[in-house]
């Protein structure tokens, strides 16, 4: 025991006299290990704490406080009691000691065994003995943390202090300037208010001590290590100011004053704070200030040039309206909402009669914001405004005026429809006839600019159940049909298609009886070739295409779906049978419509089941029939690359959201069809020969192409769906991938194989297949006839494994990098690096449930870019472009923040890529460089001369895309420091004269903007 005490004295002496700060950690470790107690530490400090020198006493208290910060959780209640008395006495000591006393008190404030009354005693001592704002920032922060800790654990005790606690804290905070401390102080004030601490007579003082920081004017220093932003302080202060209605009488005049100031940030902050306050205030708090608030908001919306301030002003007005709507009125009380809305109507309503004047839209926005506060506000405003707008529509004959009136009407009707659920009946009943008359008039007007807005209004009205009679709904559908089938205005047509898709969910029977027959008739009678208008120019959308888009758009209800899907499939069937002159583009359009229908069905299991069980067998039947019959008896149009490619997303979208039972059943049937020729799934089975899609060469060559449809189905299934006969299926796909069949067939087989490999569970099957695949690829790369097939399979398998982080992906990627030096395959392999790192539309994507690990691109970059750079450096001159192209493809898909750290090491290589004659390399490199140029001035400093020279040269490239992107890069350079650019200013301006006369408008546009920015370099205000 004596030995431990001696050791403790030694450590204390070394810390206090020897100035060895590390000894405090040794003392703390001794306390933790039970070698000595905290009270023994206090005893050993006796002579030190009684020393007449303040510096010596300070060192003693510092040692004790450091020990307590390490060991506070081990203290007993008795020890805490003794230490608190000790520290409270030390607060009366010399000011040098105060910071260390506060550190000790902070340690004690974190103890779980605080005796009753200690928190109150400590805070009273701090409030009385410490002049907080004379302390250093870190010591003031310690005081805030002591208060915070006690508020968390001793709330009821502190509340017993009454308003003295609030007054004490006001003294602590008064004059605080450091943003780190202010954040904590704001949180404390918010807790004081929201947890109902007594404010007593100090409400105004508490408000003043916080509101003096409003509005926040703080800009964090560059590279601020604390990460405190102006936004953090704004939100902290706003939470305080909006925490209680007791601040209202002081805050609202302040907000009005700041809204009327010239500072944009003050206006914005005031409006946002007002919106926050309205969630807490009631009519009583707002009553006196409503007139001033309305005047300020009105002025900002009427006069401001800032869209942000206008938006916040409108939001604040809506919040005021909502606040006034919430208050419960006594029978004899004034309805402030009513009088407030009357003022707004009085100031704004008359401007709606001037649709060509400047204030019409600000007035409409203000009225709509006020109406958006509640259903009561909405009915009040719309009841006053809509009759006026209806009257104005009839009084103005000019189309532009009428469009403005319609757009305002649309805004009010959208607001009104939001509150329908809260009302027993539609408040527009007395305006129904006038509204319908106006909208039907607009939708039949000769001016097409009215149609789009009128259709939106019709949609809002027709979506309100019971508002329009069935005869009116029929008329709406007739108008939609007419606009879809008209040949004059594509904008109206597309708006009608969009409106039809929305309304068909609510009124399916009207669309089935009135629109579908006309669409179907036009689909069948329109000539197969693309329609020409009277001037012989091809319109943007042929009638046939619009009919197809409309059929897809309205297929949002199961009853409509059962009508439209057979119509679309029948068109494909007629194309297959050669019943009329066939146009491939139209079949592709039908497939696009079927795909849209499938996507719309995905969230409704019943609709999806119908779609899946109808579309999948039909498409497979028709294509299998086409592939198994002679060209003399059947058209092969459905086996065209572009049509099969268009069918892939149709089948894929029908499979991604299937229920497990249906998915398993369909999988079994389709695998049996492709492996064994089992045609029981197919709706039509009059086939002249057996279906053998995996047989290579011979009469089954057309059948090989249908593997693309197998891919669409089987690679889109969720990963938990078991694939029967998977080993056998993979073996067949592997053989077909390396066979001498058509490019479309072996590419589809490779993609299907890769899609299955990506989802295949880890185990013997995957290991065996990958081993055989690697061997077959090696053999294929050696044999001349199959090299292209082998490299296609290699890239897809590599991608499948890269996505799932499979160990073999590295070996396969190395093989691809090695092939960049291959004289025959090098250029195509370089292009395939784009496929490795970019998203695939048909397989190996998230929609198809592929196994995709996060940040796979970053990992691929880290592992392989050094190898590409090394390969480039060692390659001969003819092969270098292949490495540059592969590198630019990889870099192009990475986020800027990943590329920036690597830019210094890669920049010289990227500049060399700009000199590569390959246009793909040039464009890819430029796209990669553009976002990086303004971010790395120090890196670019060395290369700026060569960079500008190369970019100016590329601005005259034969390829338009290269010219445009080069000009964008030259524009991006203007963000660099001025001293780097001024030496090149005249050279760039002269060189950009040529792109100004470019034959392409988009190039000229980019050149004008770029040259203007270079002209402005160095000018005042630039």
UniProtKB/Swiss-Prot annotation:
Keywords for this protein: Cytoplasm, Cytoskeleton, DNA damage, DNA repair, Nucleus, Repeat
GO cellular component: cytoplasm; cytosolic [4Fe-4S] assembly targeting complex; MMXD complex; nucleus
Disulfide cysteine pairs (residue numbers): none
Chief localisation class: nucleus
Repeat (HEAT) residue spans along the chain: 858-896, 900-938, 941-979, 982-1020
Pfam families reported for this sequence: MMS19_C, MMS19_N
GO BP of this protein: DNA repair; protein maturation
Subcellular location: Nucleus; Cytoplasm, Cytoskeleton, Spindle
PANTHER family: DNA REPAIR/TRANSCRIPTION PROTEIN MET18/MMS19, MMS19 NUCLEOTIDE EXCISION REPAIR PROTEIN HOMOLOG
Family (UniProt): Belongs to the MET18/MMS19 family.
Assembly and binders: Component of the CIA complex.
Role, per record: Key component of the cytosolic iron-sulfur protein assembly (CIA) complex, a multiprotein complex that mediates the incorporation of iron-sulfur cluster into apoproteins specifically involved in DNA metabolism and genomic integrity. In the CIA complex, MMS19 acts as an adapter between early-acting CIA components and a subset of cellular target iron-sulfur proteins.
Record-given protein name: MMS19 nucleotide excision repair protein homolog
């Amino acid at each position: 025991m004596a030995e431990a005490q001696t050791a403790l004295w030694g450590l204390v002496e070394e810390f206090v006299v020897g100035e060895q700060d590390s000894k405090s950690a040794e003392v703390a470790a001794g306390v933790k290990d039970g070698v000595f107690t905290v009270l023994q530490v206090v005893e050993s400090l006796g002579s030190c704490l009684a020393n007449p020198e303040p510096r010596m006493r300070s060192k003693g208290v510092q040692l004790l406080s450091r020990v307590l910060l390490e060991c506070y959780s081990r203290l007993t209640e008795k020890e805490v009691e003794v230490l608190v008395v000790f520290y409270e006495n030390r607060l009366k000591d010399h000011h040098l000691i105060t910071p260390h006393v506060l550190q000790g008190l902070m340690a004690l404030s974190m103890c779980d065994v605080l005796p009753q009354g200690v928190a109150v005693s400590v805070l009273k001592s701090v409030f009385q003995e410490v002049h907080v704002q004379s302390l250093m920032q870190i010591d003031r922060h310690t005081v805030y943390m002591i208060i915070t800790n006690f508020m968390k654990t001793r709330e009821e005790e502190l509340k017993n202090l009454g308003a003295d606690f609030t007054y004490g804290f006001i003294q602590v905070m008064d004059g605080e300037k450091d943003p780190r401390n202010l954040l904590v102080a704001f949180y404390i004030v918010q807790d004081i208010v929201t947890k109902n601490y007594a404010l007593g007579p100090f409400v105004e003082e508490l408000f003043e001590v916080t509101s003096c920081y409003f509005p926040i004017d703080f800009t964090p220093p560059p590279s601020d290590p604390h990460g405190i932003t102006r936004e953090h302080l704004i939100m902290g202060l706003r939470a305080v100011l909006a925490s209680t209605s007791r601040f209202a009488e002081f805050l609202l005049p302040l907000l009005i004053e700041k809204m009327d100031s010239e500072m944009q940030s003050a206006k914005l902050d005031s409006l946002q704070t007002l919106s926050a306050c309205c969630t807490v205030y009631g009519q009583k708090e707002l009553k006196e200030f409503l007139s001033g608030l309305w005047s300020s908001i009105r002025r900002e919306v009427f006069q401001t040039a800032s869209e942000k301030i206008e938006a916040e002003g409108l939001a604040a007005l809506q919040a005021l309206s909502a606040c006034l709507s919430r208050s419960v009125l006594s029978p004899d009380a004034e309805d402030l909402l009513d009088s407030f809305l009357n003022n707004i109507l009085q100031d704004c309503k008359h401007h709606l009669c001037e649709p060509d004047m400047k204030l019409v839209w600000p007035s409409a926005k203000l009225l709509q914001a006020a109406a958006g506060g509640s259903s009561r506000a909405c009915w009040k405003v719309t009841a006053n405004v809509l009759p006026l707008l209806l009257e104005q529509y009839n009084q103005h004959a000019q189309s532009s005026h009428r469009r403005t009136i319609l757009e305002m009407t649309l805004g009010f009707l959208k607001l009104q429809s939001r509150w329908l659920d809260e009302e027993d009946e539609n408040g527009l009943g007395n305006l129904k006839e006038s509204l319908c008359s106006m909208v039907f008039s607009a939708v039949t007007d000769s001016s097409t600019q009215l149609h789009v807005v009128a259709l939106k209004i019709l949609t809002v009205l027709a979506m309100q159940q019971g508002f329009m009679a069935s005869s009116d709904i029929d008329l709406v559908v007739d108008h939609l049909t007419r606009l879809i089938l008209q040949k004059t205005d594509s904008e109206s047509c597309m708006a009608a298609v969009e409106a039809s898709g929305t309304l068909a969910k609510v009124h399916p029977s009207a669309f089935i009886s009135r629109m579908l027959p006309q669409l179907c008739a036009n689909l069948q009678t329109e000539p197969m070739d693309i329609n020409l208008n009277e001037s012989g120019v091809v319109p943007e959308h042929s009638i046939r295409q619009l009919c197809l888009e409309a059929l897809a758009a309205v297929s949002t209800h199961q009853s409509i779906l059962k009508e439209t899907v057979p119509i679309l499939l029948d068109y494909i069937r007629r194309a297959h049978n050669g019943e009329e002159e066939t146009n491939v583009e139209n079949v592709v359009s039908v497939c696009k419509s079927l795909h849209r229908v499938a996507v719309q069905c995905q969230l409704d299991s019943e609709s999806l089941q119908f779609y899946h069980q109808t579309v999948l067998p039909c498409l497979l039947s028709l294509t299998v029939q086409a592939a198994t019959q002679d060209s003399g008896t059947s058209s092969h149009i459905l086996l065209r690359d572009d049509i099969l490619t268009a069918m892939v997303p149709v089948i894929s979208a029908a499979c991604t959201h299937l229920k497990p039972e249906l998915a398993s059943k369909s999988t079994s049937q389709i695998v049996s069809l492709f492996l064994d020729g089992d045609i029981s799934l197919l709706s039509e089975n009059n086939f002249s020969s057996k279906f053998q899609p995996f047989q290579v060469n011979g009469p089954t060559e057309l059948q090989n192409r249908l593997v693309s449809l197998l891919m669409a189905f089987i690679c889109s299934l969720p990963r938990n769906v078991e694939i029967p006969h998977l080993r056998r299926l993979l073996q067949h796909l592997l053989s077909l991938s390396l066979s001498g069949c058509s490019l479309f067939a072996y590419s589809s087989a490779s993609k299907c194989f890769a899609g299955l490999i990506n989802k295949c569970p880890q185990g013997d099957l995957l290991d065996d297949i990958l081993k055989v695949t690697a061997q077959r690829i090696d053999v294929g790369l050696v044999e001349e006839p199959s090299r292209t097939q082998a490299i296609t399979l290699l890239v897809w398998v590599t991608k499948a494994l890269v996505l799932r982080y499979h160990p073999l992906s590295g070996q396969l990627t190395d093989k691809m990098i090695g092939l960049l030096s291959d004289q025959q395959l090098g250029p195509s392999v370089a292009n395939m690096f784009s496929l490795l790192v970019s998203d695939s539309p048909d397989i190996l994507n998230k929609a198809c449930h592929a196994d995709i690990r996060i940040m796979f691109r970053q990992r691929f970059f880290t592992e392989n870019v050094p190898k590409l750079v090394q390969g480039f450096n060692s390659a001969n001159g003819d092969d270098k472009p292949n490495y540059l192209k592969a590198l630019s493809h990889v870099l192009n898909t990475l986020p800027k923040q990943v590329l920036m750290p690597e830019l210094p090491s890669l920049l010289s290589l990227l500049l060399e890529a700009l000199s590569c004659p390959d246009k793909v390399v040039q464009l890819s490199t430029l796209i990669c460089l553009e976002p990086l140029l303004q971010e790395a001035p120090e890196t670019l400093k060395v290369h700026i001369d060569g960079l500008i020279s190369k970019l100016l040269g590329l601005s005259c490239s034969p390829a338009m895309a290269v010219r445009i992107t080069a000009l964008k890069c030259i524009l991006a350079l203007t963000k660099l420091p001025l001293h780097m650019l001024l030496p090149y200013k005249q050279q760039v301006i002269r060189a950009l004269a040529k792109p100004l006369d470019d034959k392409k408008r988009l190039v000229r546009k980019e050149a004008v903007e770029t040259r203007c920015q270079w002209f402005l370099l160095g000018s005042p205000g630039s």
